[in-house]
Amino acid sequence: MLTLRPADVAIWSELLPEVLSGKMEPDGRAERRLESEQVGAFRFFAGTALAARADARAPAWLGAGAAVDGPDLRASDYVAEILCRCGHLAAPSSPFSDPRASAHFSRLPAMRACRAEFVSFAVDSLPPESGSLRVLDIGCGDGETLAELLPALVAAGRWDEVSAVTLLDPSPAMLSSAKARIASAWPDSHVEGRVARLEDVASTLAGPYDLVVGSLSLHHMPAEVKRRTLAALAPSLDHLLLLELDADHDTPELGSPRLAASVHQTYGWMLAQILGPDALDPVARESADRFVAPALVSLLTQPRGLRSEHHMPRERWMELLADALGPGVRPLGIRTALATPHADLFALHLGRPD
C-alpha cells in the first residue's frame, strides 16, 4: 500500500497550487519530483482538488491518473465518470437503499475469502462457552456475515445453541433482509431488529450479550464517537469481534495529500473489485453507485466529523478499544483477514478472560 512520508506530503502540497493555477499539466514533467509509484495517486489528488472547485480541468487530471493506475485501481476513472454523469462531485445513488448493492460487494471473491478468514479467526479465538449464545450484530447489513458466523461457532462448540439475536442497522431495507435470513436459519431463536445507529442507542440496548459483532460497521463514527459509544456498550458485552479496513480516514484533513492517497488506494481497489470485468453489468454498476460512491464522495467533499467514513489503522483501534472498554476487556486476538497491495482488512477479538 502506498504510504506518504512527510517529505512526500510536502512535495504534493507544494505542487498543488501549480495545478490549481494552471501552471502544471498532467504531462509528467513537473511530476518528476515524485516517485513513480506516486504519480497515479497524485493525479487523483490533483483531479479531485480541481473537482471540488468545479474546475473543468478535473477530468483531464483524473483521466491521466487512470492511464497509469491500471486495472487494479479504479478511483480516478470512476470519479471522472461521476463528473460526467452528475456534473459535480455527487453520489449517483443514495446509500444502502437497495440490499442488492451490498450483496454484490459481499459476494465478490475477495470479500468471500475475507469473510471466511473472519469466521475462521472467530472460531480460533473465542473460547468454548457452555449454554446458549446471545449476540448483537452492529450494522448487520443483509446479515450475510452473521449467517456464516453463527453455524460455525455452534459447530465448533463455542456455544451450544443460539438463543437470541439482536440486529442493528440504520437501513430498513438491509435490516429486513437480515432479519428474514437469520430467522429462517434459526427458527427457534428470538430474532429482533432495530432500525438505528449504534451511537444513538448504545446506552439503551438491553443486553447482556455474550458476543457483539461489528463487520465493516464502526468506521462510520469519528474516533471520539467510537470511544464514547463503545464505552456505553462495554458493560453489556463479554466478547467483541470486529472486521475493519486498515486505513486512516479519521485524522487527515479534507483535501490533504494523505487522505487523497489513501482513498485512491483503498476505494480504488474496492471499485476495481466491484466493476472488474463486469463494468457494464447493471448490478455491478448499482453496487458501485450505491455502496461505494456515497462513501467516496463523502471523503472527498466533507470534513472530519461530518464525512461518513472514519476508518482507522489497527494500532489506533487497539488503543481506542483499550481505553473505551476498560481494563476488564482485553485483546484476545488479531489477524489480517485480507491482504492486497492496496488495501488490508483485519479482524480483532476483545473479551473478558475467564
Regions found by a protein language model. Name each.
Residues L216-H220:
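Short catalytic micro-motifs in class I SAM-dependent methyltransferases
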Residues A90-L126:
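Class I SAM-dependent methyltransferase Rossmann-like catalytic core
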Residues V213:
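A conserved beta-strand element that flanks and buttresses the S-adenosyl-L-methionine
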